[in-house]
């Protein structure tokens, strides 16, 4: 066939406006980029199309001179951090967000949730408790010492 296949970011067409000053947020799945755009419009949301997708020299060229934040799925942060040297050579600024890893429960980490999963989810009592324990670590000692259990409303 007479064509050349070129991998690109999902949402890359949104970068054609040269006047945009929004930071670019990159996620793994197309669904996540769409959901995040709805909830967090301060960023231009792009998707790689997979954990390893679009992290090559040609594909990332569209990010030249841009401020970029990578928002990997739970469990993928180290893999995405390995892409920093490539991106740092092209982007004005790039960082990997730890917001999911820092706030997820062990169960959520095991499931490998992404930011869309959190944006679409209603906070459960277990999630609220984990958030409080993260903020106030002595709370866990108190819970353990007194044998407290989480009681959910019927």
Describe the residue ranges of each PLM region.
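Short, small/acidic-rich helices and loops at N termini and domain boundaries
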Residues: 106-149
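Structural alpha-beta junctions
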Residues: 41-45, 85-98
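Short, charged, surface-exposed secondary-structure boundary motifs
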Residues: 53-61, 79-80, 104-116
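Phosphate-handling DNA/RNA-contact segment within nucleic-acid enzymes
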Residues: 1-66
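Acidic, metal-coordinating catalytic cores used for nucleic-acid/nucleotide bond scission
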Residues: 31, 51-55, 72-83
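Acidic beta-strand-to-loop metal/phosphate-binding motif
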Residues: 24-26, 63-79, 98
């Amino acid at each position: 066939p007479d064509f050349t296949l070129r991998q690109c970011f999902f949402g890359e067409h949104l970068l054609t406006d040269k006047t945009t000053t929004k930071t670019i947020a990159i996620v793994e799945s197309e669904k996540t980029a769409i959901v995040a755009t709805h909830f967090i419009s301060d960023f231009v949301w792009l998707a790689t199309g997979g954990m390893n997708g679009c992290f090559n020299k040609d594909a990332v060229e569209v990010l030249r001179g841009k401020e970029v934040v990578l928002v990997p799925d739970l469990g993928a942060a180290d893999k995405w951090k390995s892409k920093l040297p490539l991106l740092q050579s092209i982007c004005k600024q790039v960082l990997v967000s730890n917001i999911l890893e820092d706030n997820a429960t062990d169960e959520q980490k095991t499931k490998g949730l992404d930011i869309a999963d959190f944006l679409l989810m209603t906070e459960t009592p277990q999630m609220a408790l984990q958030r409080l324990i993260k903020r106030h670590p002595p709370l866990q000692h108190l819970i353990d010492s007194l044998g407290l259990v989480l009681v959910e409303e019927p």
